[in-house]
Amino acid sequence: MSLSHLYRDGEGHLDDDDDDERENFEITDWDLQNEFNPNRQRHWQTKEEATYGVWAERDSDEERPSFGGKRARDYSAPVNFISAGLKKGAAEEADSEDSDAEEKPVKQEDFPKDLGPKKLKTGGNFKPSQKGFSGGTKSFMDFGSWERHTKGIGQKLLQKMGYVPGRGLGKNAQGIINPIEAKQRKGKGAVGAYGSERTTQSLQDFPVADSEEEAEEEFQKELSQWRKDPSGSKKKPKYSYKTVEELKAKGRVSKKLTAPQKELSQVKVIDMTGREQKVYYSYSQISHKHSVPDEGVPLLAQLPPTAGKEARMPGFALPELEHNLQLLIERTEQEIIQSDRQLQYERDMVVSLSHELEKTAEVLAHEERVISNLSKVLALVEECERRMQPHGADPLTLDECARIFETLQDKYYEEYRLADRADLAVAIVYPLVKDYFKDWHPLEDGSYGTQIISKWKSLLENDQLLSHSSQDLSSDAFHRLMWEVWMPFVRNVVAQWQPRNCEPMVDFLDSWAHIIPVWILDNILDQLIFPKLQKEVDNWNPLTDTVPIHSWIHPWLPLMQARLEPLYSPVRSKLSSALQKWHPSDASAKLILQPWKEVLTPGSWEAFMLRNIVPKLGMCLGELVINPHQQHMDAFYWVMDWEGMISVSSLVGLLEKHFFPKWLQVLCSWLSNSPNYEEITKWYLGWKSMFSDQVLAHPSVKDKFNEALDIMNRAVSSNVGAYMQPGARENIAYLTHTERRKDFQYEAMQERREAENMAQRGIGVAASSVPMNFKDLIETKAEEHNIVFMPVIGKRHEGKQLYTFGRIVIYIDRGVVFVQGEKTWVPTSLQSLIDMAK
């Protein structure tokens, strides 16, 4: 219950002088703050107050003494005034106030006026009483005086626990020894008003800290409290600090972020989240919008609703200031980030420029070396030009010029390689080469100049060319040198050369074949040599010409090879014409034809023999007369001399047709006239010895001789009971057995040879892998039949590589071989291909 109604005046207003004695019952902020304060002033209720409450009487005359030294104000006593003449001096009054201040306990009035309960004020005529208990002062002064002459129990207990007098307390005697010194303040001013109040002991135990640092720290602390919470909360605000390294890391990350798309940067955005419509012209402008509240909206309306005491009002809100501060912070961060990027850019630029400086220095040194080398090269070239002047004192020779070019190539290779060697050679070397070969006779001394030209080939020829052809004239100095300087001498010599005198020309080209370019050699053979040979073959007559044609055609085979094939057809034609009236008794035909056997293909050679030689041999063998008593063997010898020239099958065919029928007929007639079997045996063995093993191994020849043995055995067996030459039957049986055994041994030996050949071939095939495709099979068959199988360089048909199989041109497509016909390509079998190639 409030007592405010007791202190109202007649008009119902409270008296201002009575505010100090008014006490409200509501809970104030001071009550909340001093709820747990043990030093707050408490009012102890007496028994009378507890009984009568607010109606308890106050007896000012019988008030009990209090420790405060003051009595409660007696408002019933008359008002006393202090005379001005009796007023104490300033010094005495100050002393009394000091004593009062020292003795006055902490009361509620010492706290701020707005924090404690308001008391009833007294008028200016009232003074607080300074009286205390009447008899308590002296008693307190003598309290504990018995300790002056004896030791207390505490001292004894400490000594029992190990205390040593003169040392500090604690396990390690870390306590203080001397009591804390006190220093009396000079006046009544505040702390620090009269200078430092620290004692000597305090200065020793706690050295003086830097006052400026303390002041700065205190200033920063107070500065952070410039906006104070009106609720009285002492909670310190939390600050987040960003270091420079964090800002640098943030800047490095932001550089990696992708830039917004250009399409989105031009989009019109209408913001209707506020009180009014706002228009932005890009999404990036939305991020720059600050959180300033709309005008006209009360601050209280923007705060979230809270209940009771938790509803706290902010001290004051300054969104513009916060926005400006945020802008300053962001600008500072951007400046730091930009400075870091600029610093990194400058560092990178320094590194880049240092590298460029090093590279530039290297380039400069290289250019200086190049300039020095070029000046030396220029000096050598100028020396060559000076010595090439006509009527000079020291004319330049081809060997000396080669040594100068070798110096250029060895010491100044880069400059020599990059220089235009063609122009340099044309200006210097060509005149010297012309002068060197002006008296040259190639057919007399074919190797003249090969050494010096070989040296110039290594100096002038460009090894980087992919193809060496006539198109290299503009880029290769050596090819141009040989074509423009050396080739005219060769043309003059070939124009005066006789093809029948082939050896000097062949030796000359053999000497220069490895020096001159390939295309120049091909040009010589195709355009100069072959036309001369073709013309000479057309003029050759085998019947009247005493010089065999092979003597001046075949020496060109190593150089020209397949280029000579167009000459073979007219040669065969002329030889066929010459053999029309030939008789086997003329051995010159064999001498003329024998060199051509290895040149012509097996098929063409066999065809030539069957057309021109075999019929003549058959006629000769048909004229042979077999007479056991008087045998003329000339015709037989003429035929058998051609055994190596014609094939075994052709020779066996001649024997089967023209020899064995007559020979068996003579044998039968001889056996029917009581012959001498010993003579028949000798005659049989004599004729058999006239044939070579290759002919005897032929099955047809074996059959004929076995037939003769059978005839002899039948003749011996059929004459049983008649007169028989003693031992004839045994001799014929022995002869038959011997011949059969020889045939068996020969067949066994042939089989063994074939097995060995197959074994060796199998080892070779296993070592070189079995043919896995049709092309490998054709190549294997070509090797077995001694047929040339090789690709035609630069020739294709429908993207397929062309090959030469003997004289036939073929190509392979998906396991099928195609042969070139008259108008189209015809597929054929492998065996037919082999027969056609032969």
Curated annotation (Swiss-Prot):
Compartmental location: Cytoplasm; Nucleus
InterPro entries for the chain: G_patch_dom (IPR000467), GCFC_dom (IPR022783), STIP/TFIP11_N (IPR022159), TFP11 (IPR024933), TFP11/STIP/Ntr1 (IPR045211)
Outcome (variant: residue 168 to A): No effect on nuclear speckled pattern localization
Chief location category: cytoplasm
GO cellular component, one term: cytoplasm
Sorted UniProt keywords: Biomineralization, Cytoplasm, mRNA processing, mRNA splicing, Nucleus, Phosphoprotein, Spliceosome
MF (Gene Ontology): nucleic acid binding
Region (Required for nuclear speckle localization): 711-735
Region called Disordered, residue ranges: 1-74, 86-137, 193-237
GO BP, one annotated term: biomineral tissue development
Coiled-coil parts of chain: none
Tissues in which the UniProt entry reports expression: Widely expressed. In tooth it is expressed in ameloblasts and odontoblasts.
Motif Nuclear localization signal, residue numbers: 701-706
Ranges annotated as biased composition (Acidic residues): 14-29, 92-101
Superkingdom, natural source: Eukaryota
Region (Required for interaction with DHX15): 1-51
Similarity remark: Belongs to the TFP11/STIP family.
PANTHER family: TUFTELIN-INTERACTING PROTEIN 11, TUFTELIN-INTERACTING PROTEIN 11-RELATED
Its job: Involved in pre-mRNA splicing, specifically in spliceosome disassembly during late-stage splicing events. Intron turnover seems to proceed through reactions in two lariat-intron associated complexes termed Intron Large (IL) and Intron Small (IS). In cooperation with DHX15 seems to mediate the transition of the U2, U5 and U6 snRNP-containing IL complex to the snRNP-free IS complex leading to efficient debranching and turnover of excised introns. May play a role in the differentiation of ameloblasts and odontoblasts or in the forming of the enamel extracellular matrix.
Protein name: Tuftelin-interacting protein 11
Species, as recorded: Mus musculus (Mouse)
